[in-house]
Amino acid sequence: MASLNPGRLMMARTVEHLSQRQLSELIERTQHAQIPAAKISRIENGLVECSATDLNKIAAALDYPIEFFNMMSEDLNPLDLTYRRTAKTRISEVNAIVGEYQMLDAAVNKVTNKLGMAHRPSWIDALAPRQSGPLDTLDIDRIAQRAREQLRLESKGAVPNMTRALERSGILVVPMRSMGESSEYKQTSEGVTAPALKKGSPIIGYIRRQVTGDRMRFTKAHELGHLVLHAHHRELTKKQMEDEAHTFAGAILMPREDAESTISETTMLSEFVAIKAGWGISISALVMRASALGLISADRKRSLQMQISARGWRKMEPVTVDVEHPLLFKQMLGKAYGRIDSPTEVTVDSFDAVKDLGVPFRYLDFWTDGLKAESEQVGVYERRFPDDGDTQMMVMPNDCPTPQDVSMK
C-alpha cells in the first residue's frame, strides 16, 4: 500500500480549485483511469487506503510529485491567516490560499533548515504589543519607528525598496498563485501572513498580477504590521486589526515627522501627486495618513476623496511606481539546489528540489518570479504557470540580499 497522507490529497485538490468530482473527471481524462469521486472522498476521510496505482494516477493527473502526498504537515487554521474575507469571498478561494500558504511555509522552512539559517527574527516578538484593546495612532507610530530601525532604514525619509528591507531582516516576501492570479477568482485581499505562527521563518504572501507598485509596497508594509502588532492575541476584532495594520503601513512608509513637514490642510491634490512620486505611496493612502495624524480635517479629507473619485483615480492614479520583485527565496533555492548565476538569476536542479520539497516546480518557479532549470539545458522542460505579463525590474547587485545577509544560527 502507498503511504498517503489523506490531508495532503485534500490540500492539493483545494489548491487547484478542484472538487472531488472534478478531480475524478481529470483523472479519467488525462490518465484514462477511473477513481470515482466517492472513493476520493473515502480516501480523504481515511476510510480506505489509497493503492500505489491510484496514488500514481492522482499525482500524474494533478502533476504533483509523489513525495507531496507522503509528507506530514501541521494543519493551518484559516483564522491564523490575515487574508481579509468579505461576504463575496468564496470558501474555495480561502481554502486554496490556506493550502498554498501551508505548502509555501513547509518549503521555506525546509530550505531554511537545509542552509542553517536563522528562523523568526527576535525583534518581531520584542516589538509586539501585549496589551488588550486597540492601539492609538501615536503608539503605532512609535512601534513603526522601532521597526524601521530593525529594517535598517533611516528614521526619516522614503523607503527605497520595501521588499528588500523586509528580506534583509529575514522576512520572506513571496507572490502567491492562489491570490487572484486567475481571472476566474476575484481577490478580496492583496496580502497574507500568519502572525500567530511562532515556528519557522515569517512569510508575507502577496498578489502580483494587475497591482500597481505603490499598492504592493503598502500591502507588504501592511502585512508587516500584522506580523508585529498581532503576534500575540490582544482581543481585537478583524476590523481593529486591519485598521492597526493600515496605520502601521502608513507610519513605516511615511513617518510622522515627514508627514507633518510635507502635508497640511492646504495641500492641493496636484501636490499629492508630486508627493506620491517622491514617496512611492498612493495618493489615497497619503490622504488617509494625513487624516490619521490630524494634518487635514474631516471636511478636507472628504473633499480630496471626492476629487480622487471624480478623476477616476480610484482605479488608476497618475504616477507609476516601480514594482518591487523579491529575491531572497530565489537565492535560497539556488544555494540549496543549484547555483546563483547573478543577483536576479538562479539555476536549480529541478528534480532534486521538487523531490526534496515535495512541491511542483511550477509553484517554486512562481514563488520566485522565475527559476532556470538545469534539465532545460538538455531539452527537458518543466511545466510553468502562464506568464502574467508582469515586467521584471532591473535591480542593482549591491541592493540584493543573499542567504548570507540573513543571520545564521
Task: Describe the role of every protein-language-model region.
Residues 1-409:
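Active-site hotspot residues in diverse enzymes, especially metal/ion-binding acidic/histidine motifs
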